[in-house]
Amino acid sequence: MAKSRRDRNSWGGFSEKSSDWSSEEEEPVRKAGPVQVLIVKDDHSFELDEAALNRILLSEAVRDKEVVAVSVAGAFRKGKSFLMDFMLRYMYNQESVDWVGDYNEPLTGFSWRGGSERETTGIQIWSEVFLINKLDGKKVAVLLMDTQGTFDSQSTLRDSATVFALSTMISSIQVYNLSQNVQEDDLQHLQLFTEYGRLAMEETFLKPFQSLIFLVRDWSFPYEFSYGADGGAKFLEKRLKVSGNQHEELQNVRKHIHSCFTNISCFLLPHPGLKVATNPNFDGKLKEIDDEFIKNLKILIPWLLSPESLDIKEINGNKITCRGLLEYFKAYIKIYQGEELPHPKSMLQATAEANNLAAVATAKDTYNKKMEEICGGDKPFLAPNDLQTKHLQLKEDSVKLFRGVKKMGGEEFSRRYLQQLESEIDELYIQYIKHNDSKNIFHAARTPATLFVVIFITYVIAGVTGFIGLDIIASLCNMIMGLTLITLCTWAYIRYSGEYRELGAVIDQVAAALWDQGSTNEALYKLYSAAATHRHLYQQAFPAPKSEPTEQPEKKKI
């Protein structure tokens, strides 16, 4: 039900608000607080607290309202939660001119503190969703999200990428919180994290994300670019400019960022003062914060959260309600819980992999060129023993070449790439053996010679057994001779036309097994292997008849 109340809130001052509350959850504002909805476990897996999300996003007052999701992300210990609490003050007191509150009032809301260790983990959402009237009279729900800082000492790169990407995918306004400047590594990390988010989303011709705001804290160069949005716009234009004299890598980073976000802006914020930075007991009282910071803070927060600045969350051009946002939250986290996406890698690991793969490619290419000189297409047949000797020598040279290349990652990291090189060289050697054998005139004639021998033997046996009256054996030999003759003609056609090459390979394998000078067991094994490998070809060539009664063996004629 709707309630109008004048409450003393924890951010200082009285405010009169009209809010919708479900009959099940009539709680005063002061009991609202941060709720962790994305939990990063000790094993670096992710868990979504669906029950908490349901309570927040499916309350009767907001579930069918279009939602504005505001998120703050960036490196850890850079004041994200501190900033979020000033956003809360504004949301609770925005109708008041002096919304920042009493100068002696401690700052409360999302948990924050000074120091060097992380405070926020996962993703936290403020438990009260604010209902705000936009300029066109439409009432929208505003959701505030605080995120775990990136690159702390307890998180993997995948943890940081997932939290940043997920918050960017869910939010309609993403505040990228940076300290002192926008450096090239900040842009590269943004490129990595947004690409990790784009991978998890459906492909679309639209830009996947909405508003990105670079918030540069502790800005120390107001004489170059003034504090605020105007100075930030000029600064960002220069920083994200793509020019022809830039390296291709730098151009790609900037093009990628522009391709991901519909709106990109920047705000330059001064340092809050030495008392804030050095006092271990600082609790957020405005009286201890520099006036220049407070002055620009009063500009920044309304610039972000005033009704005309709110961007309704859209996905593929469709406006999303709180109910819909809940479903997207569930769908996205399932993707990151699985193994469908590649794990992001550190710059060292990615460089080391590229380094080792390049060394593998160089060594493999060297082996290939030397083998081509020995038994390439225009070279004559080489004795198998000589070919094997050359192979072993060149393989050893390639391994030495790989070991001699300076590679990042160390010996242990390079070991699996050495194994990969040896495996790929062995595969190439098998291909060279086949290529070399094809030049042997006796090898090329093996199949027709074998089939001719089979035809001759079965012809002789059929003649002898027919002469002495063993008609069944004679008929069987005649049948084998006929099938062999058909096989020979088929093989000749395949060699001439180049069609049905797989069937030709089967015939060659069977002939090779019959030709084999080794033991009978080896020949039978080769026959069995050929049959098992190409069984589907036999089934296509000789389809089994549909259920018919078994024919009785042909009786001997009297």
UniProtKB/Swiss-Prot annotation:
Q: Where are the transmembrane segments?
A: 450-470, 472-492
Q: Which GO biological process annotations does it have?
A: axonogenesis; endoplasmic reticulum membrane fusion; endoplasmic reticulum organization; endoplasmic reticulum tubular network membrane organization; protein homooligomerization
- Enzyme's top EC category: hydrolase
Q: Where in the cell is it found?
A: Endoplasmic reticulum membrane; Golgi apparatus membrane; Cell projection, Axon
Q: Membrane topology for this entry?
A: Multi-pass membrane protein
Where is the segment annotated 3HB (three-helix bundle) domain?
Answer: 347-438
Enumerate the residue ranges of region (N-terminal hypervariable region (HVR)): 1-34
Catalysed reaction(s)? GTP + H2O = GDP + phosphate + H(+)
Q: What is its EC number?
A: 3.6.5.-
This chain's function reads: Atlastin-1 (ATL1) is a membrane-anchored GTPase that mediates the GTP-dependent fusion of endoplasmic reticulum (ER) membranes, maintaining the continuous ER network. It facilitates the formation of three-way junctions where ER tubules intersect. Two atlastin-1 on neighboring ER tubules bind GTP and form loose homodimers through the GB1/RHD3-type G domains and 3HB regions. Upon GTP hydrolysis, the 3HB regions tighten, pulling the membranes together to drive their fusion. After fusion, the homodimer disassembles upon release of inorganic phosphate (Pi).
Report the protein name in the record: Atlastin-1
Gene source species: Rattus norvegicus (Rat)
